[in-house]
């Protein structure tokens, strides 16, 4: 009899847990109309934009509004045999802001696929219930794919090396002297990276191999180091790129 009571109590507990979980799943998150950023760490200017000479409270350009300018000259080579992209680019950056810039920030979006990328750690969905054999091997067995930028050199317009620091998807370039308002600077970056197999992770960029034809089809995006935005709102926009979202150019 006691055994029956324990079994009945256990079934009743499980039934209650299932009902509660169902009720929690049916509750939809409410949010204020027009407000989509619910992060507790969002920037104050999203809620309290102060008007100034650069822009009005509505965000419209003011009399002192400016935009920086970056000109690119690139030599790009697609190594189809090894599924790699090699590039060398010269960037001419025009400082149209009223500020003197002591360093430059460059976005390295492809580093989201680097071997040591922290992007996978942002996945808070827990362990998948089921894996395909390929996805399981890719996640737990195979050596992580290294699709990040390999920066071979960063040089000024006279060919002298510039020191730089890479932090995940951002690179800070140190310049010899501050770039004053109204001036411009030219520098070059030589780089390459491995192109990922699009059929494995369905990334925004990658290739798909067709054995019958013996060739690859490529979809390429965010493939070159590009200048980060410098604006009157927050100065340098040097937030990390984690694989979702977009930044201004």
Where are these regions (language model features)?
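Bacterial Sec-dependent N-terminal signal peptides
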Residues: 1-25
């Amino acid at each position: 009899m006691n055994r029956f009571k324990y079994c009945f109590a256990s079934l009743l507990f499980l039934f209650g847990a299932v009902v509660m979980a169902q009720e929690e799943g049916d509750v939809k998150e409410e949010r204020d109309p027009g407000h989509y950023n619910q992060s507790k760490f969002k920037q104050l200017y999203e809620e309290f934009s102060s008007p100034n000479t650069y822009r009005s409270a509505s965000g419209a350009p003011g009399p002192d509004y400016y935009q920086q300018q970056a000109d690119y000259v690139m030599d790009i080579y697609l190594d189809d045999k090894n599924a790699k992209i090699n590039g060398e680019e010269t960037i001419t950056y025009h400082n149209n802001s009223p500020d003197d810039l002591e360093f430059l920030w460059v976005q390295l979006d492809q580093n989201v696929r680097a071997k040591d990328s922290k992007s996978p750690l942002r996945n808070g969905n827990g362990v998948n219930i089921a894996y395909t054999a390929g996805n399981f091997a890719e996640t737990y067995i195979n050596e992580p794919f290294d699709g990040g930028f390999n920066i071979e050199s960063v040089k000024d317009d006279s060919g002298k090396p510039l020191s730089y620091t890479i932090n995940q998807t951002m690179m800070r370039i140190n310049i010899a002297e501050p770039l004053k308002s109204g001036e411009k600077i030219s520098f070059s970056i030589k780089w390459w990276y491995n192109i990922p197999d699009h059929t494995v992770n369905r990334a925004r960029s990658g290739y798909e191999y067709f054995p019958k034809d013996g060739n690859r089809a490529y979809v390429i995006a965010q493939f070159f180091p590009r200048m980060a935005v410098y604006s009157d709102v927050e100065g340098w926009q040097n937030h990390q790129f984690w694989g979702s979202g977009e930044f201004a150019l």
